[in-house]
From Swiss-Prot:
Its main location: mitochondrion. Belongs to the ATPase gamma chain family. InterPro entries: ATP_synth_F1_ATPase_gsu, ATP_synth_F1_gsu, ATP_synth_F1_gsu_CS. It is a peripheral membrane protein. It is found in: Mitochondrion; Mitochondrion inner membrane. This is ATP synthase subunit gamma, mitochondrial. The keyword Lipoprotein does not apply. Residues 1-45 form a transit peptide. Keywords: ATP synthesis, CF(1), Hydrogen ion transport, Ion transport, Membrane, Mitochondrion, Mitochondrion inner membrane, Transit peptide, Transport. Gene3D superfamilies: 3.40.1380.10, ATP synthase, gamma subunit, helix hairpin domain.
Amino acid sequence: MAMAALRREGRRLAAAPFTSPTPLNALRSSLVSPSEEIGLSGVRSISTQVVRNRMKSVKNIQKITKAMKMVAASKLRAIQTRAENSRGLWQPFTALLGDTPSVDVKKNVIITISSDKGLCGGINSTSVKTSRNIHKLNSGPEKENKYVILGEKAKAQLVRDSKKDIELIITELQKNPLNYTQVSVVADDILKNVEFDALRIVFNKFQSVVSFVPTMSTVLSPEVVERESESGGKLGDLDSYEIEGAESKSEVLQNLTEFQFSSVLFNAVLENACSEQGARMSAMDSSSRNAGEMLDRLTLTYNRTRQASITTELIEIISGASALEG
């Protein structure tokens, strides 16, 4: 609702007439370009009512951005605790099965995690840019690269130029509060519908409200893990573990890989959600400050316009009185 109100104020602002020699886009100035100054050379031609309407619109936008900042801060606190707790879930698997981005495989699936909503800075563009770079680095005559997209914003960008490489699209993942059961269902859906040798999970790792790092986690298929362990590479230490029970080594690796993927994906989704809310909080704070600066400039314009109008009226009264006396 806050975003809809923001759009309504933007349309209202764009429709209002403004006769100053220097046109003013108040919405853009309050949200994007705080450095734009209002031209004051034509204050006499500006109606005080027009300036008051502008001030009212900017105040409404400022109220919306402040509310969105508080909502983002509340969501961030809730998600951040769960994201920190989830790190202890996937780290043992990374220690056991490794995170080996340099392993050469033929079928790469790049899982790009983004948000469903905007007004959160450049986190979605960063994820998409990182995914495209990974796609480019792993390209080759005998290699196949596919995308799995989580989130509307990555979908909107990747569909334009990589539609043929998109294997699966999942949106509205954050419609309900994120939990492990929900993400594990998504992981099962990916494992059942996508063939891969390596899953490259791209997300934004949360560091602080104003800082996030584009990150890639790699999950290998059970076949590649078994091949690498037998070849004595980075996963050669797996043979030192004794497998108990009736299950074969391949079955154990299958189960471990599936659990590793769901755990890593759960952490990645939470980290990206933290980064999203932090970026939105920062963006709305900046927008609120810009709106305050815009109000200061509009107040100055209003006062000068009103002063010019009063001065003009006084001159007309004095001139009329002088004419009558003369």
